[in-house]
């Protein structure tokens, strides 16, 4: 199920998305003023934000921490009508849902972000395990 929120009576409905990210990608988002995702690398044909926070937490904690030493969870809003052009893919269980955005369309996708990209959680290893730092 895709949840949408409404910013105000006159604004368009938005879709809340989350993105697990490592330190390099987060630095590029910060450099954009927290307004845009950086271009994908040549071996990354798809940008895939996820549709629920729990899945983003699992990726940040279980994949990004071992790979990069830190994992972050970001949250952002996108115009819901615009987001419908991209397929939702189930990457595992029923709640493991990703929005698949082709890399060549990421600049346009960024133009439809509403507000700023927010850092909502960070995870770091503690005695061989990961722990939560964030809100």
Label each residue range with its predicted role.
Residues 2-48, 54-135:
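Conserved NAD+-utilizing ADP-ribose enzyme module
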């Amino acid at each position: 199920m895709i949840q949408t929120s409404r910013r105000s009576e006159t604004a368009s409905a938005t879709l809340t998305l989350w993105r697990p990210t490592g330190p390099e990608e987060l630095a590029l988002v910060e450099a954009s003023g927290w307004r845009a995702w950086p271009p994908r690398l040549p071996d990354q044909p798809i940008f895939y934000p996820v549709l629920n926070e729990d899945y983003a937490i699992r990726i940040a904690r279980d994949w990004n921490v071992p790979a990069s030493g830190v994992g972050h969870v970001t949250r952002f809003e996108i115009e819901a009508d615009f987001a419908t052009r991209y397929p939702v893919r189930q990457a595992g269980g029923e709640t493991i849902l990703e929005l698949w955005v082709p890399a060549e369309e990421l600049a346009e996708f960024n133009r439809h972000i509403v507000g700023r990209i927010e850092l909502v959680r960070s995870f770091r290893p503690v005695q061989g395990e990961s722990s939560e730092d964030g809100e």
